[in-house]
From Swiss-Prot:
GO terms for cellular component: chromatin; cytoplasm; cytosol; extracellular space; membrane. Associates with the subcortical maternal complex (SCMC) composed of at least NLRP5, KHDC3L, OOEP, and TLE6 via interaction with NLRP5 and TLE6. Interacts with AXIN1; the interaction is direct, enhanced by protein kinase GSK3B and casein kinase CSNK1E activities and decreases GSK3B-induced beta-catenin serine and threonine phosphorylations. The lineage of its organism: Eukaryota, Metazoa, Chordata, Craniata, Vertebrata. Residues 19-42, 94-126, 202-225 are annotated as: Disordered. The keyword Metal-binding applies. It comes from the Eukaryota. It comes from Homo sapiens. GO terms for molecular function: DNA binding; DNA-binding transcription factor activity, RNA polymerase II-specific; zinc ion binding. This is Zinc finger BED domain-containing protein 3. Residues 111-122 have a biased composition (Pro residues). Secreted in blood plasma, and expressed in skeletal muscle and adipose tissue (at protein level). One of its GO terms (biological process) is negative regulation of protein phosphorylation.
């Protein structure tokens, strides 16, 4: 192994592989987070990286294009990016460290972790929490009753307003009928007054006319000796 490069035992590599392969999903749980190699946050991690680490840059070769095997210290060209060159890392491991791979079980998926037991039924509240819930329930019931009482009062007020509106309209009709009756009575009174004035004029005209002469009376002694005496009243 070259100097300055960290060494890694098979147990440490196997632990990294187990951590990388652990990601079984359970109902209701999200996927397990995927580990990432040092210095590259968010990049997918392959089990092969448990046996390699990035080699420092060399003259003519940019940093990140070479990976150093933790088992033998050999540098393997992998190309830029963490997705590129993973097959080259696996080829090196299968060709140079097949025995270690078989003994560690790398490349095979470990059994998924058991799912946590489902949550049991919620325990009944006790103490202050129970009293608080009871008070909240009582307040809710009281508020509901208050709302119903207010609704009944509003309905009664609306009914009273409608009754008052009907009464007001009836009074307006009565006032219009009374006004019509007053107009009719006024017309009749004026007609009677006109007739009275006409009768008064007629009576006045009759009072100024000359009196008619009384009728002539027959004198029983007027017919004497065959003479007719005519009495003239002056």
């Amino acid at each position: 192994m070259r100097s300055g490069e960290p060494a890694c035992t098979m147990d440490q590599a196997r632990g990294l592989d187990d951590a990388a392969a652990r990601g079984g999903q359970c109902p209701g749980l999200g996927p397990a987070p995927t580990p990432t190699p040092p210095g590259r946050l968010g990049a997918p991690y392959s089990e092969a990286w448990g046996y390699f680490h990035l080699a420092p840059g060399r003259p003519g070769h940019p940093s990140g294009h070479w990976a150093t095997c933790r088992l033998c210290g050999e540098q393997v060209g992998r190309g830029p990016g963490f997705h590129a060159g993973t097959s080259a890392l696996w080829r090196h491991l299968r060709s140079a460290h097949r025995r270690e791979l078989e003994s560690s079980g790398a490349g095979s998926s470990p059994p998924a972790a058991p799912c946590p037991p489902p949550p049991g039924p919620a325990a009944a509240p006790e103490g202050d929490w129970a009293r608080l819930l009871e008070q909240m329930g009582a307040l809710a019931v009281r508020g509901s009753r208050r709302e119903r009482e207010l609704e009944r009062r509003e309905l009664a007020v609306e009914q009273g307003e409608r009754a008052l509106e009907r009464r007001r309209r009836a009074l307006q009709e009565e006032e219009r009928a009374a006004a019509q009756a007053r107009r009719e009575l006024q017309a009749e009174r004026e007609a009677l007054q006109a007739r009275l004035r006409d009768v008064s004029r007629r009576e006045g005209a009759l009072g100024w006319a000359p009196a008619a002469p009384p009728p002539l009376k027959d004198d029983p002694e007027g017919d004497r000796d065959g003479c007719v005496i005519t009495k003239v009243l002056l």
